[in-house]
Structures are given as structure tokens and as C-alpha cells.
Curated annotation (Swiss-Prot):
Major subcellular location class: secreted
Database matches in InterPro entries: Adipokinetic_hormone_CS, AKH/RPCH_hormone
Swiss-Prot/TrEMBL keywords: Amidation, Cleavage on pair of basic residues, Disulfide bond, Flight, Hormone, Neuropeptide, Pyrrolidone carboxylic acid, Secreted, Signal
Signal peptide range in chain numbering: 1-22
Record carries keyword Signal: yes
Family recorded in the similarity comment: Belongs to the AKH/HRTH/RPCH family.
Species this chain originates from: Schistocerca nitens
Protein name: Adipokinetic prohormone type 1
GO cellular component: extracellular region
Domain of life where this protein originates: Eukaryota
Positions where Pyrrolidone carboxylic acid occurs in the chain: Q23
Amino acid sequence: MVQRCLVVALLVVVVAAALCSAQLNFTPNWGTGKRDAGDYGDPYSFLYRLIQAEARKMSGCSN
């Protein structure tokens, strides 16, 4: 039983490491880049407010 748990844990670690591997390349010539974070501010704030509203609704139901 312990050996099986160890094998499963090792398998999970290997799969997680394989999914997390990436290559990063940095260059000083990128400047500001093509995508500015300011363009995505409104959808993110909308999602944040939506999640807050749903959390308030759910907390009201638990009473």
C-alpha cells in the first residue's frame, strides 16, 4: 500500500514537472510589447465584481 502511494505521488510530481516546463527568452528590444495590460483592465474588473456579487449571494444562502 505504501509503495503504491509512493509510485502515485512520484507520477504526480513527474506529470506536474512536465506540464510546468517552459522556455523564457528575454530581450532588451521588446520595449512596451504589443499587449498592454491597460487593454484588459475592464474585463478583469468586471469579472472581479461579478465574483464578488456571486459570493455575496452564496453567503446569504448559507444563513
